[in-house]
Amino acid sequence: MAAEKGGSSDEERKPLTRGSMEYRDSSNSLHYSSSAASLSLAVIDRINGSTHDTGPDEIGRGDRDYSDDGEYDLEEADYIPSGGKPVQKKVKIVLGFLLFLCLSGWSLAFVLFLFGGHESSKTSIVYEDNISDTGSQGIKITLDEVFDGTWSPNSRDISWIPGPNGEDGLLLEKGASISNGYLRVEDIVSRKDPKSSKKPIVLMQKAYFNVSGEAVFPSRVWPSPDLKTVLVLSNEEKNWRHSFTGKYWLFDVESQTGQPLDPAAKDQRVQLASWSPRSDAVVFTRDNNMFLRKLSSNEVIKITTNGGVNLFYGVPDWVYEEEVFSGNSVTWWADDGEYIAFLRTNESSVPEYPVQYFVSRPNGEIPKPGGESYPETRKIKYPKAGAPNPIVDLQFFDVGKDEVFSVDIKGDFADSNRLIIEVVWASNGKVIVRSTNRESDVLHVAVIDVLSRTGKIVRKEDINALDGGWVEPSQTTRFIPADPDNGRLNDGYIDTVIYEGRDQLAYYTPIDNPKPIVLTNGHSEVVQAPSGVDLKRGLVYFVVAGNEPWERHIYSVNFDGTSLQPVTNVSESSYYDVSFSNGAGYAFLKYAGPQVPWQKVISTPANEVTFEETIEENNHLSERLRQYTLESKIYQYIDIDGFSLPVLERRPPNFNQTKKYPVLFYLYGGPGSQTVKKKFNVDFQSYVAANLGYIVVTVDGRGTGFIGRKARCIIRGNLGHFESLDQIQAAKIWAAKPYVDESRISIWGWSYGGFMALKTIEQDGGRTFKYGIAVAPVTDWRYYDSIYTERYMHTPQRNPGGYDNAAISNTTALANNIRFLVMHGTADDNVHIQNSLTFIDKLDVNNVHNYDVHFFPDSDHSIYFHNAHKIVYSRLADWLVNAFNGEWLKTYDPTPNDSILRRAATWVGMSI
């Protein structure tokens, strides 16, 4: 249930800005303006009766502020009809001149608003996106099309790779034709210039190679930094969400031949392998022990020897993989290749949880005779809330001395009260280590010197005392080396900090300075930042949740916090992502919505070379949108207890204000999460609105991300309380709308969303929500993992009342709903089936029977085994249709019908 995280390369970055108040836009079709200016333009164009052609170069322009049904909707405000009388020519000229003046002023004001600490009520602001304009003539999307890739945007993964001699703008391409090479490195600019002297470097000519008669087919590849050898993974098998095992090989580029990573154990499965920055060695973990293979020898060096069932070296256990690092590695090379840092994880005291498989046998072993009828059981070391955690400590390996050592840090947390959440190598043998206490509300930043083998805490932050919140694990801290020629006298680092109630960027220098230079501030919050750094020019760039939390835009700022510049076109309400080449001369810009996604590689403004190449336009989706009828999306805010909460309302095609529509609320709602996003997405909710004809509403309530820490942290210690009240209040707002049938309102969610669906209908007691659907729900936070749960709830020993309140336990209230549905995979290693089974037991004990249940044998949290994923959504859709058709009312208080019984009896020749 870990929130989605993303990291960024530690390589040097450059900005994407060209000068004051500029953004990079290939079409040059829009000038920089605030959203308020765009709103005015939309209104003026509507008065004039004009329309916008939102082609690829004008994505999302102009049509976000009014709806296609002629309603300029400010909640229940009057609307301006699209067929109004045209404005006279003189009025147009005056309005145009006034608009020009306003745009000029707003251009300067926008950045000041965005990062100037301005806070305003957004309750009545409404934005609409309608990407399909076929009306009633279009084709309806089907449920199969939602999941078979019909509506999935094509997306190219650009893998930037550093050049062995400092070259910038190099791409690693896999899967090219045999004539061009299966794996190759190519200069992004020269590949479009046939006269260029920069030729591609072919690393692997073919898509496979042979080693001693064994054909090796790569599933993942990692070129060495000098591009002379490729580390290859084959025979990959999934472990948990992020981890996998396989056979590893070393492929020599010059000879085009391969060899096992460990020639003495070529068939043994390896958990993790990574290159030395010097390209002369590979460190790897096998059977939870670490080894080093130097390319100068066929022998491997044992770094550790006592790894096994309870001791992990270099790889995380289940809970650290899921909740802290969101990855399969806890191994870090120093930049000079002299040292390796790694975590040792001791699970000796962690209780086991058995996951049973009734149909499949994931371990691949054939049971002994007589054992075929018994399920396979996989025991996981899984620390539930309040249970013993794994003990994790940081260790180091001196490559030259072949020695493992650790460094004590005075004043650090006790072993049982420590979570290590990030490790970043600095220069001259120094390491930055971020750790928290068990409940994740006190942060320590330590600096370790591996040369002197000393360490000290350089920064402490009590987040609980600051705002009652917590520390979210992240791996985005960026080391900034000293560079006196460019004004940096000391080493430092950039981190995300809490400033004036928001997540902002800060620069700490020297490296042991506890007081930062705050780089960003104001209304918006940075997202997984920093995204990159231009060391030469002293610039940081980052992604920000823009003027509206559902947007993503890219900005840059100087190391001293001055010259905040937009990179993307902030006058358009858009959702962007970006990655940069290792020298930051080029950027891979990804537009994700609200219109059809596209991808481009562009040169950055600091680059002397001007370059732009469209990588993907998704023309197939543009064509499909001309054929199909999709829902319209209304983005707006509602005010609940003084908080402006983002809402997405999906309306069916040909929406009619005079009709009464059923409403389905869809949510996730986990702490720091976000579901209301302006991304192109045709999903199950689209199917419900566009095919079934229901309204779908999503509310990012209190506790979710990018609406300020005050709204986020209020939920701590009492998960589900404020979040469910927000959903109930929102449902009451929608129930009062003239186009909503208040007797047909339902809610559904998966995982944390499943918990929220149950908690909401429990709190509501059938007064507003009549139906609910929960997939893989947590029903008692005592059953979920410790690191995630205690971050938001403290321990059960410290907060027993909070855990009692958060549990789904009021069966009397649940009995007042018409009906609800629970679905769960029996092999869920994340949210255990224990949650649903104990919940159903409570219902049985209290004689509650207004529910349905569906278990999926051997499916994990994603519910895919044996066609299960399709069945989940088919069942969900059918159940929902039956609910809104009133079928479940017939089961609410069933009574015999004599006429039906008589007809049935005649079919079998009986008499009654």
From Swiss-Prot:
The chain crosses the membrane at residues 93-113. Residues 114-912 are vacuolar. It comes from the Eukaryota. Residues 7-25, 54-67 have a biased composition (Basic and acidic residues). Coiled coil: none annotated. InterPro entries: AB_hydrolase_fold (IPR029058), Pept_S9_AS (IPR002471), Peptidase_S9_cat (IPR001375), Peptidase_S9B_N (IPR002469), Serine_Prot_S9B/DPPIV (IPR050278). The keyword Nucleotide-binding does not apply. It holds the Pfam family Peptidase_S9. It is found in: Vacuole membrane. GO terms for cellular component: fungal-type vacuole membrane; plasma membrane. It is a single-pass type II membrane protein. Its EC number is 3.4.14.5. Its main location: membrane. Residues 1-92 are cytoplasmic. It catalyses: Release of an N-terminal dipeptide, Xaa-Yaa-|-Zaa-, from a polypeptide, preferentially when Yaa is Pro, provided Zaa is neither Pro nor hydroxyproline. GO terms for biological process: proteolysis. The active site is at S751 (charge relay system), D828 (charge relay system), H861 (charge relay system). Residues 1-30, 48-68 are annotated as: Disordered. PANTHER family: DIPEPTIDYL PEPTIDASE 10, ISOFORM B, PROTEASE FAMILY S9B,C DIPEPTIDYL-PEPTIDASE IV-RELATED. Type IV dipeptidyl-peptidase which removes N-terminal dipeptides sequentially from polypeptides having unsubstituted N-termini provided that the penultimate residue is proline. Belongs to the peptidase S9B family. This is Probable dipeptidyl-aminopeptidase B. It comes from Paracoccidioides brasiliensis (strain Pb18). The lineage of its organism: Eukaryota, Fungi, Dikarya, Ascomycota, Pezizomycotina.
